[in-house]
Amino acid sequence: MVHFTPEDKTNITSVWTKVDVEDVGGESLARLLVVYPWTQRFFDSFGNLSSASAVMGNPKVKAHGKKVLTSFGEGVKNMDNLKGTFAKLSELHCDKLHVDPENFRLLGNVLIIVLASRFGKEFTPEVQASWQKLVSGVSSALGHKYH
């Protein structure tokens, strides 16, 4: 379990309140699919993913990215109970979708890069460290049901 200090919680929520979930979620998922193309196999129904520009402009990628980041927001609200917050999603991704849990870590790292690019100097090393704790905790919670 990840322990969040009061400073961590402030660092995370101060950024989260300014995040455009649709925009950042869409970009984060799209970047994941471009940089780690093997992750595309989970998104066969999304249509054209044949090039970086196709992925970045794909409306289904953007919509699912929003859905993913909206769910991530539940983790922001429930930092002290990440395992419980993501229990059902962990089960879904493990038992039905068979997603490699390493992909959760990769997406978390991409999210941090997108946030850093959006927030610039406001995304200080301390803020980044707090966000690393959060994405690590969320990744661990999502991977919890795996055997």
From Swiss-Prot:
<dbReference type="GO" id="GO:0046872">
    <property type="term" value="F:metal ion binding"/>
</dbReference>
<comment type="similarity">
    <text>Belongs to the globin family.</text>
</comment>
<feature type="modified residue" description="Phosphoserine">
    <location>
        <position position="14"/>
    </location>
</feature>
<dbReference type="GO" id="GO:0020037">
    <property type="term" value="F:heme binding"/>
</dbReference>
<feature type="binding site" description="distal binding residue">
    <location>
        <position position="64"/>
    </location>
    <ligand>
        <name>heme b</name>
    </ligand>
</feature>
<dbReference type="GO" id="GO:0005344">
    <property type="term" value="F:oxygen carrier activity"/>
</dbReference>
<dbReference type="InterPro" id="IPR002337">
    <property type="entry name" value="Hemoglobin_b"/>
</dbReference>
<keyword id="KW-0349">Heme</keyword>
<feature type="binding site" description="proximal binding residue">
    <location>
        <position position="93"/>
    </location>
    <ligand>
        <name>heme b</name>
    </ligand>
</feature>
<dbReference type="GO" id="GO:0004601">
    <property type="term" value="F:peroxidase activity"/>
</dbReference>
<keyword id="KW-0813">Transport</keyword>
<dbReference type="GO" id="GO:0031838">
    <property type="term" value="C:haptoglobin-hemoglobin complex"/>
</dbReference>
<dbReference type="InterPro" id="IPR000971">
    <property type="entry name" value="Globin"/>
</dbReference>
<feature type="domain" description="Globin">
    <location>
        <begin position="3"/>
        <end position="147"/>
    </location>
</feature>
<keyword id="KW-0597">Phosphoprotein</keyword>
<dbReference type="GO" id="GO:0072562">
    <property type="term" value="C:blood microparticle"/>
</dbReference>
<dbReference type="GO" id="GO:0019825">
    <property type="term" value="F:oxygen binding"/>
</dbReference>
<dbReference type="InterPro" id="IPR050056">
    <property type="entry name" value="Hemoglobin_oxygen_transport"/>
</dbReference>
<dbReference type="InterPro" id="IPR012292">
    <property type="entry name" value="Globin/Proto"/>
</dbReference>
<dbReference type="GO" id="GO:0042744">
    <property type="term" value="P:hydrogen peroxide catabolic process"/>
</dbReference>
<dbReference type="InterPro" id="IPR009050">
    <property type="entry name" value="Globin-like_sf"/>
</dbReference>
<dbReference type="Pfam" id="PF00042">
    <property type="entry name" value="Globin"/>
</dbReference>
<keyword id="KW-0479">Metal-binding</keyword>
<dbReference type="GO" id="GO:0043177">
    <property type="term" value="F:organic acid binding"/>
</dbReference>
<dbReference type="GO" id="GO:0005833">
    <property type="term" value="C:hemoglobin complex"/>
</dbReference>
<keyword id="KW-0408">Iron</keyword>
<comment type="function">
    <text>Hemoglobin epsilon chain is a beta-type chain found in early embryos.</text>
</comment>
<protein>
    <recommendedName>
        <fullName>Hemoglobin subunit epsilon-M</fullName>
    </recommendedName>
</protein>
<dbReference type="GO" id="GO:0031720">
    <property type="term" value="F:haptoglobin binding"/>
</dbReference>
<keyword id="KW-0561">Oxygen transport</keyword>
<feature type="modified residue" description="Phosphoserine">
    <location>
        <position position="51"/>
    </location>
</feature>
